[in-house]
Amino acid sequence: MSALRNYLNKIKPNFQEGGKLHAFESVFDGFESFLYVPNTTAKSGANIHDAIDSKRIMSFVVIALIPALLFGMYNVGYQNFKAAGTLDAASFIEIFGFGFLAVLPKLLVSYIVGLGIEFAWAQWKHEEIQEGYLVSGIIIPLIIPISTPLWMLALACAFAVIFCKEIFGGTGMNIFNVAVGARMFLFFSYPLAMSGDKVWIAKDSIFGLGNTLPDGFTAATPLGQLAQGGIPDASICDMICGFIPGSIGETSVIAIAIGAVILLWTGIASWKAMGSVFVGGIVMALIFQALGMTPIAWYEHIILGGFCFGAVFMATDPVTSARTEKGKYFYGFFIGAIAVIVRVMNPGYPEGMMLAIFFGNMFAPLIDYCVVQGNISRRAKRAINK
């Protein structure tokens, strides 16, 4: 690494003011700060120095996402071979290899488009490149169906980065989760590509791996089957493990739970917000079930669809979630409850987690305001009573 450090020091003057590559200063600084600790100090304001900076936070979140990503790759291949009836004859390498080749282009498109816009925006505004998209770039491909065309994904990434992040001031200033913005853009712009029975299974072989399925092949998700009053084909064990059709990274409760442990252990995610999402979903599901308004059991609401993934990786986003400690309880409960309400009250679309997180982001500042004003009011009353 010392050789790389020496090389960067050698070419750095070219990117500084007066250098022939000064136009790409932000790009160079972005790569340098990604590889090494920046040799800069704060220019203004009071700053608390800690061992955990934004780069390390993003790195821990990416590590927490890896189990869901790897299992998602395997499940993509698993569903393809299962649909073709050749699962028993396929090896682990064939199944995972097919899934890897199917998911990799989506990861590349997400990062190329998203980081490309961030680099261009930073250079245009003469600002430092932030690390925020390192997480969004991996989450966005994990919350879409495997059949989503790459051009749709590229449009969604561009929309999310520009209109959900950069126009608000960049990383740390956005009020809406970037991945939620991309998912909602796809759902409202291309609803047929985001829902239904034809989007969850990869249908084309890749470099000789996998199987080519008929164009008319369909496979409903267990949540979709339950929403229509049917009986899901998968067992509870398969639902928890993740061997079911669904968005790439949302199917395995176990893989998501591993990520949750990492986020909670490192202190990056708030257990108050995360736990409250599950409590809100369970309470609302029990209410609807008691009223006879849904055939879906409370635990099925939790383990199916994007509920677990959204609760662990998206509702806990420290930038877009509630900041006050008491507010995190209300924020999480609100998201969990709204997710189940949308699922039950909207018969045309069985999922509701992304919309719930969007509304949660919208109301987070109001929740914090109410909590702060409540604290001020109580302190004022105590002062008067004294």
How should these model regions be labeled?
Residues 128-209:
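Membrane-interface helix-loop-helix junctions at boundaries between adjacent transmembrane segments
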Residues 154, 175-180, 298-306, 328-330, ...:
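Loop-to-transmembrane alpha-helix initiation sites
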Residues 274-325:
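A beta-strand-loop signature enriched in Asp, Gly, Thr, and Trp
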Residues 1-107:
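N-terminal signal-anchor module of multipass membrane proteins
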Residues 42-48, 114-125, 162-172, 258-266, ...:
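C-terminal ends of transmembrane helices
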Residues 96-110, 147-156, 239-253, 295-307:
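Structural signature of hydrophobic alpha-helical transmembrane segments
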Residues 113-118, 133-142, 157-164, 255-262, ...:
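Hydrophobic, membrane-inserted alpha-helices
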